[in-house]
Amino acid sequence: MIYTGIDALDGLLEGGIPDGSRALFAIEPEADGQHFLITLLHTAVVSGKKTLVIAPFTSKDAYFVDIAIQSHYHLDCYDELISFLEQSDVEAIIRENPDQDTCRAAWRDRIRSIVKKDGIDLIIVYLDVLSDYFDFAGAVSLFDDLGSDKPVTIAFEYFNLFGEEMLNSILEEIPFDLVINLQSGSGVVSFFNFFTLHTVSWLSLPSRSLPYIVTEGHIVPYIPKIVVTGPSNSGKTTFVKNISESGMSVDRLGLLGTPTTVALDIGHMASKGFDINIYGTPGQERFDPIVPQLARNAMGVILMVDVTRPDQMARALKLKTIVEGNALVPVIVVANKADLEYSVTEEEIRTALEIRPGTPVYFISAINRRQCRAVIDSMVDQITRFEY
């Protein structure tokens, strides 16, 4: 198994990339996607994998320096694990073999020789220069039948200038075990980079665009908004506070002398390798006009109900309808205060709230941090793994 080094992605892939797989990282214009391959390379050599890097656009020293500046990864510390074909090697092969067929044979011989001599586990290929010379299919075919006595994983990076339609046409002819499409400014939330698991041959996963940010050269998968909504005093503020590593709420004393949220709760946490922002909406009816704005671009909705107050189900249904709007997003129902005496059943909740089949319903106590975290873990799975 080859780990990508991105915890959320490795989790989605159920551990990483199986040995012997072919992976394609297709980067669309303006997407900040080159760090995926850099992180993969660094993770591989740290774990002792012998790696061949084919970078026809630069020298080995310049490549190492550039990565150290971008990501603070010092690959020179693992020099004995990294074989390299650099710009001067590429130019020499082309110069000495002006005929394309002999050039192709020279490339294949050189790659096979390094793989066998150095016991290579992983090949990192920057494909653009090779595809300009041999075309895409011809460049990829250089890595057929490597003659190794062990499975060799190959990760290609390719700048896809023509979008998903072009990518689909390529993949109809050339199969890969893993295809990750890296995009900018599309999907559920604008102004973020997105990665889409286009193909995962060993798993059944929906093709879904998930945001990520790049900070100091490192990939951070990101869920910018999960909304927690529900009637007043259903436990939203307690829930958000209990799951958050940092956050704030805007509240004042209600008629019963207890704090009641009049604006929103904001929390931040990490789950399954994702950085997550949590927004709790006010439950009072007079704030309904602002709830759609608070819920705009949410990637998931947690609907909280008080199981000791079945009379509030109609209000909960109204809030669910407002938050969902016309968008189809995953919903989880949290039946809070399950540590107290109550009589409402899961079936009654499902009927009253008109929730879709398969929607999880969790009976919890919002003061129990472990139970609250389990709800967020489930929401991450709903967002990333399941059809909705």
Walk through the language-model features, giving the residues of each.
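G-domain G4 guanine-recognition motif of GTPases
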Residues: 160, 182-184, 306-307, 332-344, ...
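Conserved C-terminal guanine-recognition region of P-loop GTPase G domains, centered on the G4
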Residues: 307-357
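Phosphate-binding/switch loop-helix module in NTP-utilizing enzymes
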Residues: 89-148, 286, 297
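Canonical P-loop GTPase G-domain recognition
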Residues: 341-388
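Glycine-rich P-loop/Walker A and Walker A-like loops and their local beta1-loop-alpha1 context
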Residues: 7-9, 16-58, 235-237
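Conserved G1/Walker A P-loop phosphate-binding module
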Residues: 218-257, 272
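Switch I (G2) and immediately adjacent beta-strands of P-loop GTPase domains
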Residues: 254-286
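Inter-motif core of Ras-like GTPase G domains
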Residues: 287-309, 322-326
